[in-house]
Design a protein with these regions (language model features):
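Cleft-lining beta-strand/loop regions that shape enzyme active-site pockets
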Residues: 2, 144, 153-155, 159, ...
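Flexible glycine/proline-enriched surface loops and loop-helix/loop-strand junctions
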Residues: 229, 313, 392-399
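Conserved P-loop NTPase
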Residues: 354-358, 365-397
Length: 422
């Protein structure tokens, strides 16, 4: 894989996380992003680049602003009924500056939050084992996928379940997904009680789970058709170890005689850019995978495949309206190179880049810094990637139908690959 970089300005300039893994479960994080503020995703992490000593030439923090802040602090000290702390007030100032951008993907991380964000991207956590996104209307955390043999799976939490309450805290529409993930995660061996609404039953459930250390297994696989030797690999998000897990899965299927491959990216909110680029390098011929441009149209980075080990098999990629960000990068590249047939629904349409910029006190900010473009130069932001074969799930589909007869997208993928295998 080759990466070429254009000229970049050193200014305050990603997961999907987009999805969040609460497996520790951390978040669709590194970060990736889904439509509903899901964490996890397309993070460009400018780790090691410190921006604290930049010469200030702005106009926001002027003398009048400082004087007004001092007046506000004095009024709060004298008149506010409840207790607060200097640290809370200061963090509120920093967060408020970022929130004023009115960008759902921009965020200020306290040192504690940033440390958890970095942990979330590593692939091992202490938590309950569920990947979540956030509903933009209610603020509720929606289960996207459940880790096998985890507290969440043992408690029978299912995809599409809505987490409405965490211990005694009722989730608000204004809550940030990072904040919710922090409340669900905790020390190994401690309990968390969740109130869950299951749409398929129209019922609320209350479950208590004990957090434990879990490896965030973002990849699962099996031989979907043992006669035709059609392999199936599901990728729920892109964290640091996903690329290695994906290669191992494919190599294992190849050792079993695999003749065609179905990659399931449905409801994958995204994740780390470096991970999806590495996976595309394994699947594509030599050439461009994705490139980024800043707001002035300058090319910041171009990511290319070296074609050192292209997987030469018929492929299908399954996607839906919750496939976002890094998932769309992979989908678009495989489609435009003609190496895979895309089956399902139009993807979400998140084609912007967030960068996480660490500060010297251990805190960090996440800002939208660029836009992605596909190998053919297409802008997918707010448009998504259209499938080659559009297939919707039936109205009576529920999560228990996954990979079954009612999973019409999965069945169509098998049909396409069976037609390509002799």
């Amino acid at each position: 894989m080759r990466i070429t970089k254009g000229k970049m300005k050193h200014n305050f300039k990603k997961w999907i996380l987009g999805a969040a893994v609460i497996a520790g479960c951390a978040g669709m994080m590194g970060c990736s992003f889904t439509k509903d503020n899901t964490k996890s995703g397309d993070l460009n992490t400018d780790a090691g680049k410190r921006h604290d000593n930049l010469e200030y030439n702005g106009s926001v923090v002027d003398e009048d602003t400082l004087e007004k802040l001092a007046s506000l602090e004095t009024i709060i000290d004298q008149s506010y009924y409840f207790d607060t702390s200097d640290e809370n007030m200061q963090n509120g100032l920093y967060a408020g500056l970022i929130e004023a951008l009115d960008d759902p993907y921009a965020k200020y991380y306290t040192p504690e939050e940033f440390a958890k964000l970095q942990e979330d991207s590593s692939g091992e956590y202490a938590g309950i084992g569920v990947v979540v996104r956030q509903d933009e209307d209610t603020g509720y955390a929606i289960a996207v996928s459940i880790t096998e043999d985890s507290p969440a799976s043992e408690a029978d939490i299912k995809p599409d379940d809505l987490i409405c309450k965490i211990d005694d805290y009722e989730i608000q529409e204004s809550d940030d997904l990072d904040y919710l993930v922090t409340k669900i995660r905790g020390e190994e061996g401690t309990d968390v009680t969740l109130e869950i609404y299951r749409p398929s039953e129209r019922k609320y459930h209350t479950v208590t789970l004990t957090r434990r250390k879990l490896e965030n297994s973002t990849v699962s696989y099996h031989m979907a058709d043992t006669d035709k030797k059609i392999g199936y690999v599901r990728v729920t998000q892109f964290v640091a170890n996903t690329g290695d897990l994906f290669r191992k899965a494919v190599e294992d299927l190849k050792s079993q005689g695999m003749t065609a491959l179905m990659i399931d990216l449905r409801s994958n909110p995204g994740g780390m850019l470096s991970t999806v680029v590495d996976m595309c390098d394994y699947l594509l011929p030599a050439g461009k995978i994705v490139y980024q441009e800043d707001k002035n149209g300058n090319v910041l980075s171009t990511y290319e495949s070296t074609n050192e080990e292209q997987l030469d098999l018929p492929m299908v990629v399954l996607v839906n309206g919750e496939s976002a960000s890094a998932s769309e990068i992979m989908t678009a590249a495989l489609k435009e190179y003609g190496v895979a047939t895309i089956v399902g629904e139009n993807t979400y349409g998140k084609g912007i880049v967030q960068s996480v910029i660490p500060l010297s006190d251990g805190s960090a900010i996440k800002l939208t810094t660029a836009k992605y473009f596909t190998p053919n130069g297409n802008d997918i932001h707010k448009k998504g990637v259209a499938p080659d074969i559009e297939v919707e799930l039936p109205e009576d589909y529920v999560s228990d139908d996954f990979q079954g007869e009612k999973d019409t997208q999965y069945q169509k993928g098998l049909e396409v690959l069976r037609g390509n295998v002799k």
